[in-house]
C-alpha cells in the first residue's frame, strides 16, 4: 500500500457525461475549488456515455411516445413531455454558453440537427398519434410539428421506411425538424479536455475500492492505481459518484442511510447497424415507433440516422439482452454483490411483481438474427440480412426501490440523484433519459448538496442557462429567443447536416 494521502475539495468518481458536466459547472461557479477525477478505464466516456453504448438521441419528447401516455378518459398527458423538453433546452443553453465562450469548439462534432419522427401503424395507434399531435401542437415547445397519414407525404419524410410497404394497415407519422443527434461520447471527451486545461487532476486507470466517512466529516476513498497496483488514500469534502452502473456498489459502500433499500437490475442493449452505404443514404431522421403491449418503456423500437466519427450511419434497436454485469467492463458478480440484507426484500418483491419484464427479457434473449430482421422489416420492409450486423451497446442498471405509488420493489425507469442529508456525497442512479438531461440533473445535485452557495451562484447560473428557474412552456417569447440563439450557436439551423467527403463513407466499427 502506498503512503500517499491527499485532501481536496471535490472528488468525481467516473469520467462519463455526468461527472464531466458537474465538473464543468463547478469550474465556472467556484473556479478556486480543487477537483480530482478517478476513472477505472483508460480514457473518458467509455461506458454508457460512449457513442456506441447509447442511442445518441437528444431526448426532448419530440418523437418518444412513452413520454405522452393516454389517460383513462382518452386524453393525452403531456406533462412529462414538457418536463423532458425543458430539461433538454437547459442542456442546449449550457452547451451554447460553452461554445460562445470558446470553452468548447466545433459543436458539430457532438450535436447535429436531425428530424425526429413518430411512426405508428393500426387504426387505434393512428388515432392516438393524432390526439398526441393536437395536444402538443398547442404548446410552444413543440411548434413546427407536422402530422400526416398520407402515404405520399410519408414517402417524402422517410423513403426507406415506405419503400416496398404493401400492408393496407393505416399508417401515420409526426415530424419535427428541430430534433437532434447528440454524440455524448465526443461531448464527454471534449468536456474532460476542457477540465484538464482548467487544472482538474484526472486519474485514469484508477479504481475506487472503498468510501468511508472520517471523524472530521471528510470522505476517505481507497483508490487502486491499476497500472502500478498501489493503493492510495484520497480525502474530499464532497464526493460525486457518477460511475454509471458502478454507482450503486459505491453508494452502498458509503453507508449513508439514503442508499439503503435500493437495488439494481441490469439490462444490456443490442442494436443492428447497417453496413450498406446505399441503404444508409436513403434515411435521414430518428424514427421512433410504439412499444408493443406489455413491453417495458426502454423497448421502444427506433431507426436512427447517427453521426459517429463524422460519418453517417444507420442503426435499429434496441433489443434487450441480459448480463449480471452492472458495467460493460464490469464483473459477472456485480448483481450478486449488490444484494444486501437491507435490499433483499425489495429485490424479492420486484422479482414477483415484474413477470412481464422477465418474460420480455427471456423472449429477447431467445431471438435469432432472423427474428430480429423480422422486427426490423416492420420499419424497413426491404431490409436484407446481409446488410445488417449486430452490435452490443451499453449496460443499464434500472433502479429498484420501495415507493408510495408503486409499493415495494418498484422498478424506476428514470434517472435519480441520491444524496446524504448533509449534501456531502451524491450518487446518480438509473438510465433514461440520462445524458440528454445531464445539465438539469447536475443542477439538482448543486441544489441538494450546496444550498448555502446557490444564492451567490445564481447570477452566474442565469448567465450560463438564461431560462434557469423559469418555465419555457409558460414563456413562449423567451423560449423562441433562446431556441433561436442556441440553434445559431450550436449550428442547428442547417436543414441537412454539412456534407463532407468522409460522411459518404460508411462506418461500421
UniProtKB/Swiss-Prot annotation:
Cofactor: FAD
Basic and acidic residues: compositionally biased ranges: 493-509
Domain of life assignment: Bacteria
Catalytic activity: (S)-malate + a quinone = a quinol + oxaloacetate
Enzyme Commission number: 1.1.5.4
Region (Disordered), start-end ranges: 490-509
Keywords: FAD, Flavoprotein, Oxidoreductase, Tricarboxylic acid cycle
InterPro entries in the cross-refs: FAD/NAD-bd_sf, MQO
EC top class, as a word: oxidoreductase
MF (Gene Ontology): 2-hydroxyglutarate dehydrogenase activity; L-malate dehydrogenase (quinone) activity
A GO BP entry: tricarboxylic acid cycle
Associated pathway: Carbohydrate metabolism; tricarboxylic acid cycle; oxaloacetate from (S)-malate (quinone route): step 1/1
HAMAP family: MQO (MF_00212)
Protein family according to the UniProt entry: Belongs to the MQO family.
PANTHER family linked to this entry: L-2-HYDROXYGLUTARATE DEHYDROGENASE, MITOCHONDRIAL
Protein name per UniProt: Probable malate:quinone oxidoreductase
Amino acid at each position: 500500500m502506498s503512503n500517499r494521502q491527499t485532501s481536496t475539495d471535490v472528488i468525481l468518481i467516473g469520467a462519463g457525461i455526468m461527472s464531466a458536466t458537474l465538473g464543468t459547472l463547478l469550474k465556472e461557479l467556484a473556479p478556486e475549488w480543487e477537483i480530482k477525477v478517478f476513472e477505472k478505464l483508460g480514457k473518458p466516456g467509455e461506458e454508457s456515455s460512449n457513442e456506441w453504448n447509447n442511442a445518441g438521441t437528444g431526448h426532448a419528447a419530440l418523437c418518444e411516445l412513452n413520454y405522452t401516455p393516454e389517460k383513462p378518459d382518452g386524453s393525452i398527458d403531456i406533462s412529462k413531455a414538457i418536463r423532458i423538453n425543458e430539461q433538454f433546452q437547459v442542456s442546449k443553453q449550457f452547451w451554447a454558453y460553452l461554445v460562445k465562450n470558446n470553452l468548447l469548439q466545433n459543436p458539430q462534432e457532438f450535436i447535429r440537427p436531425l428530424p425526429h419522427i413518430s411512426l405508428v401503424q393500426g387504426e387505434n395507434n393512428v388515432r392516438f398519434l393524432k390526439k398526441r399531435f393536437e395536444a402538443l401542437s398547442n404548446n410552444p415547445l413543440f411548434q413546427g410539428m407536422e402530422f400526416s397519414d398520407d402515404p405520399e407525404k410519408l414517402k417524402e419524410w422517410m423513403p426507406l421506411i415506405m419503400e416496398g410497404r404493401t400492408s393496407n394497415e393505416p399508417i401515420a407519422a409526426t415530424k419535427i425538424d428541430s430534433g437532434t443527434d447528440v454524440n455524448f461520447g465526443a461531448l464527454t471527451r471534449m468536456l474532460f479536455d476542457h477540465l484538464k486545461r482548467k487544472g482538474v487532476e484526472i486519474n485514469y486507470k484508477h479504481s475506487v475500492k472503498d468510501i468511508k466517512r472520517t471523524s472530521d466529516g471528510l470522505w476517505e476513498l481507497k483508490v487502486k492505481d491499476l497500472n502500478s497496483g498501489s493503493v492510495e488514500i484520497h480525502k474530499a469534502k464532497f464526493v460525486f459518484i457518477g460511475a454509471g452502473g458502478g454507482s450503486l456498489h459505491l453508494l452502498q459502500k458509503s453507508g449513508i442511510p439514503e442508499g439503503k433499500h435500493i437495488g439494481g437490475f441490469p439490462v444490456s442493449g443490442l442494436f443492428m447497424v447497417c453496413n450498406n452505404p446505399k441503404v444508409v443514404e436513403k434515411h435521414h431522421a430518428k424514427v421512433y415507433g410504439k412499444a408493443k403491449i406489455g413491453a417495458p418503456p426502454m423497448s421502444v423500437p427506433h431507426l436512427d440516422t447517427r453521426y459517429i466519427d463524422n460519418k453517417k450511419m444507420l442503426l435499429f434497436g434496441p433489443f434487450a439482452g441480459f448480463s449480471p454485469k452492472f458495467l460493460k467492463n464490469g464483473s459477472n458478480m456485480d448483481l450478486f454483490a449488490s444484494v444486501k440484507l437491507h435490499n433483499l426484500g425489495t429485490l424479492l418483491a420486484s422479482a414477483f411483481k415484474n413477470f412481464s419484464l422477465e418474460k420480455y427479457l427471456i423472449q429477447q434473449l431467445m431471438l435469432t438474427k432472423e427474428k430480429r430482421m423480422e422486427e426490423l422489416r416492420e420499419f424497413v420492409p426491404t431490409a436484407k440480412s446481409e446488410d445488417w450486423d449486430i452490435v452490443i451497446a451499453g449496460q443499464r442498471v434500472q433502479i429498484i426501490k420501495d415507493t408510495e405509488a408503486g409499493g415495494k420493489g418498484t422498478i424506476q425507469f428514470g434517472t435519480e440523484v441520491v444524496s446524504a442529508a448533509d449534501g456531502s456525497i451524491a450518487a446518480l442512479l438509473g438510465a433514461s433519459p440520462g445524458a440528454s438531461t445531464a445539465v438539469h440533473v447536475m443542477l439538482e445535485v448543486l441544489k441538494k448538496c450546496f444550498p448555502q452557495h446557490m444564492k451567490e451562484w445564481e447570477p452566474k447560473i442565469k448567465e450560463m442557462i438564461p431560462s434557469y428557474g423559469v418555465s419555457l412552456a409558460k414563456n413562449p417569447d423567451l423560449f423562441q429567443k433562446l431556441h433561436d440563439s442556441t440553434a445559431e450557436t450550436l449550428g442547428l439551423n442547417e436543414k441537412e447536416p454539412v456534407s463532407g467527403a468522409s460522411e459518404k463513407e460508411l462506418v461500421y466499427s
